[in-house]
Protein backbone atom coordinates (compact mmCIF):
# COMPACT_ATOMS: atom_id res chain seq x y z
CA UNK A 1 0.00 0.00 0.00
CA UNK A 2 1.07 3.55 -0.71
CA UNK A 3 0.89 4.65 2.91
CA UNK A 4 3.36 1.99 4.08
CA UNK A 5 6.25 4.24 3.02
CA UNK A 6 4.92 7.24 4.96
CA UNK A 7 2.71 5.89 7.77
CA UNK A 8 2.94 9.17 9.69
CA UNK A 9 1.48 11.01 6.70
CA UNK A 10 -1.36 8.50 6.42
CA UNK A 11 -2.13 8.98 10.11
CA UNK A 12 -2.07 12.76 9.64
CA UNK A 13 -4.58 12.44 6.79
CA UNK A 14 -6.94 10.41 8.98
CA UNK A 15 -6.72 12.96 11.80
CA UNK A 16 -7.18 15.81 9.31
CA UNK A 17 -10.38 14.26 7.97
CA UNK A 18 -11.64 13.58 11.49
CA UNK A 19 -11.05 17.20 12.48
CA UNK A 20 -12.95 18.41 9.42
CA UNK A 21 -15.93 16.33 10.51
CA UNK A 22 -15.72 17.69 14.06
CA UNK A 23 -15.48 21.29 12.85
CA UNK A 24 -18.69 20.84 10.87
CA UNK A 25 -20.66 19.63 13.89
CA UNK A 26 -23.10 22.13 15.49
CA UNK A 27 -21.59 21.47 18.91
CA UNK A 28 -18.15 22.69 17.79
CA UNK A 29 -19.44 25.50 15.60
CA UNK A 30 -21.20 26.97 18.64
CA UNK A 31 -18.03 26.74 20.76
CA UNK A 32 -15.47 29.35 19.55
CA UNK A 33 -12.68 28.10 21.82
CA UNK A 34 -13.07 24.48 20.68
CA UNK A 35 -13.35 25.62 17.06
CA UNK A 36 -10.16 27.67 17.39
CA UNK A 37 -8.19 24.76 18.84
CA UNK A 38 -9.37 22.36 16.16
CA UNK A 39 -8.72 24.97 13.50
CA UNK A 40 -5.15 25.39 14.71
CA UNK A 41 -4.52 21.64 14.51
CA UNK A 42 -6.27 21.47 11.13
CA UNK A 43 -3.95 24.17 9.79
CA UNK A 44 -0.94 22.40 11.32
CA UNK A 45 -1.78 19.16 9.50
CA UNK A 46 -2.64 20.94 6.25
CA UNK A 47 0.94 21.14 4.95
CA UNK A 48 1.52 17.43 5.60
CA UNK A 49 -1.78 16.41 4.01
CA UNK A 50 -1.18 18.59 0.96
CA UNK A 51 2.31 17.16 0.39
CA UNK A 52 1.04 13.62 1.02
CA UNK A 53 -1.79 13.92 -1.49
CA UNK A 54 0.61 15.28 -4.10
CA UNK A 55 2.96 12.37 -3.49
CA UNK A 56 0.13 9.83 -3.79
CA UNK A 57 -1.03 11.43 -7.02
CA UNK A 58 2.44 11.42 -8.59
CA UNK A 59 2.97 7.80 -7.50
CA UNK A 60 -0.35 6.73 -9.02
CA UNK A 61 0.24 8.68 -12.23
CA UNK A 62 3.73 7.20 -12.57
CA UNK A 63 2.45 3.64 -12.14
CA UNK A 64 -0.24 4.23 -14.77
CA UNK A 65 2.21 5.81 -17.22
CA UNK A 66 4.73 3.00 -16.78
CA UNK A 67 2.01 0.44 -17.43
CA UNK A 68 1.16 2.08 -20.77
CA UNK A 69 4.71 3.08 -21.73
CA UNK A 70 5.30 -0.01 -23.86
CA UNK A 71 2.27 0.76 -26.00
CA UNK A 72 2.49 4.54 -26.37
CA UNK A 73 5.53 6.82 -26.72
CA UNK A 74 3.65 9.69 -25.05
CA UNK A 75 3.12 7.58 -21.94
CA UNK A 76 6.80 6.60 -21.99
CA UNK A 77 7.75 10.29 -22.04
CA UNK A 78 5.27 11.03 -19.25
CA UNK A 79 6.72 8.20 -17.17
CA UNK A 80 10.22 9.70 -17.50
CA UNK A 81 8.93 13.13 -16.44
CA UNK A 82 7.10 11.76 -13.41
CA UNK A 83 10.05 9.58 -12.45
CA UNK A 84 12.24 12.69 -12.39
CA UNK A 85 9.61 14.63 -10.42
CA UNK A 86 9.04 12.00 -7.72
CA UNK A 87 12.24 12.53 -5.64
CA UNK A 88 11.46 16.23 -5.23
CA UNK A 89 7.89 15.46 -4.21
CA UNK A 90 9.12 12.90 -1.68
CA UNK A 91 11.60 15.41 -0.25
CA UNK A 92 8.84 17.99 0.24
CA UNK A 93 6.78 15.38 2.08
CA UNK A 94 9.71 14.38 4.29
CA UNK A 95 10.28 18.05 5.12
CA UNK A 96 6.60 18.56 5.93
CA UNK A 97 6.76 15.59 8.31
CA UNK A 98 9.56 17.15 10.37
CA UNK A 99 7.89 18.16 13.65
CA UNK A 100 7.19 21.88 13.84
CA UNK A 101 7.13 23.97 16.96
CA UNK A 102 3.60 23.17 18.24
CA UNK A 103 3.17 26.82 19.19
CA UNK A 104 3.86 28.27 15.71
CA UNK A 105 0.20 29.10 15.07
CA UNK A 106 -0.22 30.84 18.43
CA UNK A 107 -0.31 34.56 19.05
CA UNK A 108 2.57 36.16 20.94
CA UNK A 109 3.24 38.20 24.07
CA UNK A 110 6.30 40.46 23.74
CA UNK A 111 8.16 42.44 26.37
CA UNK A 112 10.65 45.16 25.46
CA UNK A 113 12.88 46.54 28.21
CA UNK A 114 15.43 49.34 28.02
CA UNK A 115 18.83 48.04 29.05
CA UNK A 116 22.24 49.63 29.45
CA UNK A 117 22.46 53.13 28.03
CA UNK A 118 20.12 55.28 30.10
CA UNK A 119 17.71 57.55 28.22
CA UNK A 120 19.19 56.50 24.88
CA UNK A 121 18.35 52.85 25.64
CA UNK A 122 14.77 53.88 26.44
CA UNK A 123 14.51 55.78 23.15
CA UNK A 124 15.81 52.71 21.31
CA UNK A 125 13.29 50.49 23.09
CA UNK A 126 10.65 52.87 21.72
CA UNK A 127 12.13 52.43 18.24
CA UNK A 128 11.81 48.65 18.59
CA UNK A 129 8.19 49.00 19.69
CA UNK A 130 7.42 51.05 16.58
CA UNK A 131 9.33 48.60 14.38
CA UNK A 132 7.36 45.60 15.64
CA UNK A 133 4.08 47.51 15.47
CA UNK A 134 4.66 48.45 11.84
CA UNK A 135 5.83 44.94 10.96
CA UNK A 136 2.67 43.53 12.53
CA UNK A 137 0.56 45.97 10.51
CA UNK A 138 2.25 44.79 7.31
CA UNK A 139 1.36 41.20 8.25
CA UNK A 140 -2.24 42.11 9.02
CA UNK A 141 -1.81 41.43 12.74
CA UNK A 142 -3.14 43.50 15.62
CA UNK A 143 -0.99 44.96 18.41
CA UNK A 144 -2.44 45.58 21.85
CA UNK A 145 -0.33 47.47 24.41
CA UNK A 146 -0.95 45.75 27.76
CA UNK A 147 1.36 47.80 29.96
CA UNK A 148 3.87 50.55 29.31
CA UNK A 149 6.26 52.76 31.29
CA UNK A 150 7.63 55.71 29.35
CA UNK A 151 10.16 58.49 29.96
CA UNK A 152 9.72 62.25 29.75
CA UNK A 153 11.64 62.31 26.44
CA UNK A 154 9.28 59.76 24.89
CA UNK A 155 11.42 56.70 25.46
CA UNK A 156 10.16 53.37 26.76
CA UNK A 157 11.43 51.93 30.03
CA UNK A 158 9.44 48.76 29.48
CA UNK A 159 6.39 47.74 27.50
CA UNK A 160 4.35 44.58 27.09
CA UNK A 161 2.29 43.96 23.97
CA UNK A 162 0.11 41.19 22.57
CA UNK A 163 0.51 40.52 18.84
CA UNK A 164 -2.40 38.59 17.37
CA UNK A 165 -3.31 37.23 13.94
CA UNK A 166 -6.78 37.28 12.46
CA UNK A 167 -8.58 33.94 12.32
CA UNK A 168 -6.64 30.68 12.48
CA UNK A 169 -3.48 30.92 10.37
CA UNK A 170 -1.43 28.01 9.10
CA UNK A 171 1.50 27.34 11.46
CA UNK A 172 4.03 28.90 9.09
CA UNK A 173 1.93 32.08 9.01
CA UNK A 174 1.33 32.26 12.75
CA UNK A 175 2.63 35.14 14.84
CA UNK A 176 4.86 32.91 16.98
CA UNK A 177 6.38 31.27 13.89
CA UNK A 178 8.05 34.60 13.09
CA UNK A 179 8.26 36.51 16.35
CA UNK A 180 9.92 33.75 18.39
CA UNK A 181 13.25 34.69 16.83
CA UNK A 182 13.12 38.24 18.24
CA UNK A 183 13.94 37.26 21.82
CA UNK A 184 17.34 38.46 22.99
CA UNK A 185 19.44 41.59 23.42
CA UNK A 186 19.25 44.15 20.62
CA UNK A 187 22.22 46.54 20.46
CA UNK A 188 22.14 50.02 18.93
CA UNK A 189 25.05 52.21 17.83
CA UNK A 190 24.23 55.86 17.10
CA UNK A 191 24.70 59.46 18.20
CA UNK A 192 22.09 60.05 20.91
CA UNK A 193 19.84 63.08 20.76
CA UNK A 194 21.19 63.92 24.21
CA UNK A 195 24.84 63.85 23.00
CA UNK A 196 26.26 67.33 22.36
CA UNK A 197 29.73 66.16 21.28
CA UNK A 198 28.51 64.04 18.36
CA UNK A 199 29.95 60.83 19.79
CA UNK A 200 28.54 57.44 18.86
CA UNK A 201 27.11 55.62 21.86
CA UNK A 202 26.29 51.95 22.28
CA UNK A 203 23.22 50.94 24.25
CA UNK A 204 20.82 48.02 24.32
CA UNK A 205 17.27 46.87 24.81
CA UNK A 206 16.07 43.40 25.74
CA UNK A 207 13.20 41.58 24.06
CA UNK A 208 11.42 38.59 25.58
CA UNK A 209 8.71 36.73 23.66
CA UNK A 210 6.48 33.81 24.53
CA UNK A 211 3.41 32.21 22.89
CA UNK A 212 0.07 33.42 24.19
CA UNK A 213 -2.09 30.86 25.95
CA UNK A 214 -5.75 30.49 25.05
CA UNK A 215 -8.19 31.71 27.68
CA UNK A 216 -9.39 28.14 28.26
CA UNK A 217 -6.03 26.46 27.64
CA UNK A 218 -6.29 23.11 29.42
CA UNK A 219 -2.51 22.65 29.39
CA UNK A 220 -2.25 25.11 32.25
CA UNK A 221 -4.39 25.04 35.39
CA UNK A 222 -3.94 27.76 38.02
CA UNK A 223 -5.20 27.29 41.57
CA UNK A 224 -6.65 30.61 42.81
CA UNK A 225 -4.94 29.90 46.14
CA UNK A 226 -1.60 30.23 44.35
CA UNK A 227 -2.31 33.82 43.31
CA UNK A 228 -1.53 37.04 45.15
CA UNK A 229 -3.37 39.99 43.61
CA UNK A 230 -2.56 43.63 44.41
CA UNK A 231 -4.66 46.54 43.19
CA UNK A 232 -3.16 49.99 42.60
CA UNK A 233 -3.71 53.20 40.67
CA UNK A 234 -2.59 53.22 37.03
CA UNK A 235 0.31 55.53 36.25
CA UNK A 236 1.53 57.19 33.09
CA UNK A 237 4.73 59.03 32.06
CA UNK A 238 6.57 60.45 35.05
CA UNK A 239 4.22 58.73 37.48
CA UNK A 240 1.18 60.69 36.37
CA UNK A 241 -2.20 59.11 37.10
CA UNK A 242 -3.95 57.57 34.12
CA UNK A 243 -7.31 57.51 35.88
CA UNK A 244 -8.74 58.18 39.30
CA UNK A 245 -9.66 54.60 40.14
CA UNK A 246 -7.58 51.74 41.45
CA UNK A 247 -7.91 49.59 38.34
CA UNK A 248 -4.33 48.42 37.78
CA UNK A 249 -3.50 44.85 38.80
CA UNK A 250 -0.32 43.14 39.93
CA UNK A 251 -0.74 39.36 39.85
CA UNK A 252 1.90 37.13 41.46
CA UNK A 253 2.03 33.36 41.01
CA UNK A 254 3.38 32.26 44.39
CA UNK A 255 4.82 28.83 43.39
CA UNK A 256 7.01 30.32 40.63
CA UNK A 257 7.34 33.96 41.68
CA UNK A 258 6.19 35.15 38.25
CA UNK A 259 4.64 38.62 38.46
CA UNK A 260 2.41 40.28 35.86
CA UNK A 261 1.39 43.95 35.92
CA UNK A 262 -1.62 45.07 33.90
CA UNK A 263 -3.00 48.61 33.78
CA UNK A 264 -4.04 49.50 30.24
CA UNK A 265 -7.50 47.94 30.24
CA UNK A 266 -10.50 50.08 31.20
CA UNK A 267 -11.48 48.31 34.40
CA UNK A 268 -10.02 46.24 37.21
CA UNK A 269 -11.96 43.19 36.02
CA UNK A 270 -10.52 43.53 32.51
CA UNK A 271 -7.00 44.02 33.88
CA UNK A 272 -7.38 40.91 36.06
CA UNK A 273 -8.51 38.84 33.07
CA UNK A 274 -5.68 40.17 30.90
CA UNK A 275 -3.11 39.56 33.65
CA UNK A 276 -4.34 35.99 34.15
CA UNK A 277 -3.99 35.28 30.43
CA UNK A 278 -0.44 36.62 30.38
CA UNK A 279 0.39 34.58 33.48
CA UNK A 280 -0.96 31.43 31.80
CA UNK A 281 1.16 32.25 28.76
CA UNK A 282 4.28 32.55 30.90
CA UNK A 283 3.53 29.27 32.65
CA UNK A 284 2.85 27.60 29.31
CA UNK A 285 6.22 28.80 28.01
CA UNK A 286 7.89 27.52 31.18
CA UNK A 287 6.18 24.13 30.80
CA UNK A 288 7.27 23.79 27.19
CA UNK A 289 10.80 24.82 28.12
CA UNK A 290 10.98 22.13 30.76
CA UNK A 291 9.65 19.56 28.29
CA UNK A 292 12.34 20.53 25.79
CA UNK A 293 15.17 21.14 28.26
CA UNK A 294 17.59 19.14 26.15
CA UNK A 295 16.94 21.29 23.08
CA UNK A 296 17.83 24.90 22.33
CA UNK A 297 14.37 26.37 22.70
CA UNK A 298 13.32 30.02 22.78
CA UNK A 299 14.28 30.78 26.37
CA UNK A 300 17.80 29.46 25.90
CA UNK A 301 18.47 32.13 23.29
CA UNK A 302 16.73 35.00 25.01
CA UNK A 303 17.62 37.58 27.58
CA UNK A 304 19.47 36.34 30.63
CA UNK A 305 20.50 39.88 31.51
CA UNK A 306 20.46 43.11 29.57
CA UNK A 307 24.23 43.12 29.25
CA UNK A 308 25.40 44.38 25.86
CA UNK A 309 27.63 41.33 25.31
CA UNK A 310 24.63 38.99 24.88
CA UNK A 311 23.46 40.61 21.68
CA UNK A 312 21.58 38.84 18.92
CA UNK A 313 21.32 41.83 16.61
CA UNK A 314 23.06 45.18 16.07
CA UNK A 315 21.46 48.31 14.63
CA UNK A 316 24.19 50.69 13.39
CA UNK A 317 22.71 54.07 12.49
CA UNK A 318 25.84 55.82 11.09
CA UNK A 319 26.21 53.04 8.49
CA UNK A 320 22.45 52.36 8.13
CA UNK A 321 23.42 48.73 8.80
CA UNK A 322 21.64 45.87 10.54
CA UNK A 323 23.36 42.60 11.49
CA UNK A 324 21.83 39.43 12.90
CA UNK A 325 24.66 37.75 14.78
CA UNK A 326 22.99 34.31 14.81
CA UNK A 327 22.80 33.96 11.03
CA UNK A 328 25.39 36.56 9.90
CA UNK A 329 22.63 38.31 7.97
CA UNK A 330 23.74 41.83 7.05
CA UNK A 331 21.97 44.60 5.15
CA UNK A 332 22.27 48.36 4.73
CA UNK A 333 18.61 49.27 4.94
CA UNK A 334 18.24 49.94 8.65
CA UNK A 335 15.84 52.81 8.03
CA UNK A 336 13.46 50.48 6.17
CA UNK A 337 13.80 47.74 8.82
CA UNK A 338 12.87 50.16 11.60
CA UNK A 339 9.85 51.11 9.51
CA UNK A 340 8.67 47.50 9.70
CA UNK A 341 10.47 45.96 6.71
CA UNK A 342 11.72 43.13 8.90
CA UNK A 343 10.80 40.05 6.89
CA UNK A 344 14.19 39.41 5.28
CA UNK A 345 15.89 39.45 8.69
CA UNK A 346 13.34 37.06 10.17
CA UNK A 347 13.54 34.81 7.10
CA UNK A 348 17.27 34.33 7.73
CA UNK A 349 16.43 32.98 11.20
CA UNK A 350 13.63 30.77 9.88
CA UNK A 351 15.92 29.27 7.23
CA UNK A 352 18.65 28.58 9.78
CA UNK A 353 16.12 26.93 12.09
CA UNK A 354 14.75 24.76 9.28
CA UNK A 355 18.28 23.69 8.34
CA UNK A 356 18.94 22.67 11.95
CA UNK A 357 15.71 20.67 12.15
CA UNK A 358 16.53 18.91 8.88
CA UNK A 359 20.00 18.05 10.15
CA UNK A 360 18.60 16.69 13.41
CA UNK A 361 16.21 14.42 11.51
CA UNK A 362 19.01 12.73 9.60
From Swiss-Prot:
SUPFAM superfamilies: Release factor. GO terms for cellular component: cytoplasm. Methylated by PrmC. Methylation increases the termination efficiency of RF1. GO terms for molecular function: translation release factor activity, codon specific. InterPro entries: PCRF (IPR005139), Pep_chain_release_fac_I (IPR000352), Pep_chain_release_fac_I_sf (IPR045853), Prokaryotic/Mito_RF (IPR050057), RF-1 (IPR004373). It holds the Pfam family PCRF. It comes from the Bacteria. It is found in: Cytoplasm. The modification N5-methylglutamine is found at residue 240. Its main location: cytoplasm. Keywords: Cytoplasm, Methylation, Protein biosynthesis. Belongs to the prokaryotic/mitochondrial release factor family. HAMAP family: Rel_fac_1. Peptide chain release factor 1 directs the termination of translation in response to the peptide chain termination codons UAG and UAA. This is Peptide chain release factor 1. It comes from Bifidobacterium longum subsp. infantis (strain ATCC 15697 / DSM 20088 / JCM 1222 / NCTC 11817 / S12). The lineage of its organism: Bacteria, Bacillati, Actinomycetota, Actinomycetes, Bifidobacteriales. The gene is prfA.
Amino acid sequence: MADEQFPAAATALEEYQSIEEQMASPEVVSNPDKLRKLGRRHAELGAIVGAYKTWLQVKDDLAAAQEMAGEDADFAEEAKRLEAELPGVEEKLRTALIPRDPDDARDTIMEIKAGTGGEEAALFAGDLLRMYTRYAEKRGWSVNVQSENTTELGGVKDVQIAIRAKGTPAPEDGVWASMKYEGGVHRVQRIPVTESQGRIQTSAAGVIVFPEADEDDDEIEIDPKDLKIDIFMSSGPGGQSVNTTYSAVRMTHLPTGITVNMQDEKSQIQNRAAALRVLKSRLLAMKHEQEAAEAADMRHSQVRSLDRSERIRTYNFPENRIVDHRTNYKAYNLDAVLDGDLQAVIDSDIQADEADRLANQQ
